[in-house]
From Swiss-Prot:
InterPro entries hit by this protein: PsdUridine_synth_cat_dom_sf, PsdUridine_synth_RluA-like_CS, PsdUridine_synth_RsuA/RluA, RluA_PseudoU_synthase
Reaction(s) catalysed (UniProt annotation): uridine(2819) in 21S rRNA = pseudouridine(2819) in 21S rRNA
Main function: Pseudouridylate synthase responsible for the pseudouridine-2819 formation in mitochondrial 21S rRNA. May modulate the efficiency or the fidelity of the mitochondrial translation machinery.
Location in the cell: Mitochondrion
UniProt record, GO biological process: enzyme-directed rRNA pseudouridine synthesis; pseudouridine synthesis; rRNA modification
EC number per UniProt: 5.4.99.43
Enzyme's top EC category: isomerase
Organism annotation: Saccharomyces cerevisiae (strain ATCC 204508 / S288c) (Baker's yeast)
Protein name as annotated: 21S rRNA pseudouridine(2819) synthase
Length: 254
């Protein structure tokens, strides 16, 4: 595999890159005191450092900055801002929302186990709406929008972005851990190929800069053998099936 295929660029304009993050790569520098013990076979080099090394001949990569994070075992779209100013404006939106900075929204696809009964633990709540629903925890400090495609496939959109938020909400509130997410209760076993990959993919990134809105769909191409991600949901090219795409493209702002 060529280096550029390891972290493929899905889209590029004057403000940012969209890359398709593989599993097993941290998006931020990890704590080296624990990383070697918990992930002895994984290189701790973060995504941005690898990205710059691969695309070093590209004149704009030196000033690049990551704007958001994905857990090392999560795949899919990450936005990399080309400048400090762009990074600040995207971060401002993530912190304050509304018309602050550059708009950045992220939708994820998760394949979950069939527990089928929702939990109602203290400090957790589910709210249902006509288009989508809410998972809420810690008095509203952690909020995730979600919609079920079927009993094992969920599309989620972060409202807040706390560490492990989607993984926590799906396992603790819906009582349906993401496939292969052993840390959050998954019991289904997969081949060694998937040791550092769970069935959670950053599948759609929406940006708005000025009056221009762009929607990016990111294919699930990593270890796409039909095992972790069934052909019921992802075809051989990594594209999500039409029912999933339709939910990804729905406007959940209204």
């Amino acid at each position: 595999m060529s280096l550029k295929k390891q972290i493929p660029i899905i889209f590029e304009n004057t403000h940012y890159f969209i890359v398709n993050k593989p599993p097993g790569i941290p998006s931020q520098p990890p704590d080296c005191r624990t990383w070697g013990r918990t992930h002895p076979n994984l290189d701790p080099t973060p995504l941005l450092e690898r990205f710059k090394a691969i695309y070093y001949s590209h004149r704009e990569v030196e000033l690049c900055r990551t704007v958001h994070r994905l857990d090392h075992c999560v795949t899919g779209g990450m936005l990399i801002a080309k400048t400090k100013d762009g990074s600040v404006k995207f971060s401002r939106f993530l912190q304050k929302g509304g018309n602050n900075g550059y708009k950045l929204q992220r939708k994820y696809v998760a394949i979950v186990e069939s527990s089928g009964r929702f939990n109602k633990p203290n400090n957790y709540e589910i709210k249902y709406g006509p288009k989508y629903n809410f998972l809420i925890s810690h008095g509203g400090r952690e909020i995730t929008k979600f919609k079920e495609v079927d009993e094992n496939c969920i599309v989620l959109q972060l409202v807040t972005g706390k560490k492990h938020q989607i993984r926590n909400h799906v396992s603790q509130i819906l009582n349906q851990p993401i496939l292969n997410d052993k840390r959050h209760g998954s019991t289904v076993n997969f081949p060694e190929l998937f040791n550092d990959q769970i069935a959670l993919h950053s599948a759609c990134i929406i940006t708005k800069i000025g009056l221009q809105t762009k929607t990016h769909l990111i294919p699930m191409e990593h270890n796409n053998t039909g095992q972790l991600w069934s052909r019921k949901y992802v075809n051989e090219e990594g594209e999500f099936t039409l029912p999933i795409k339709e939910v990804l493209l729905e406007n959940w702002d209204q």
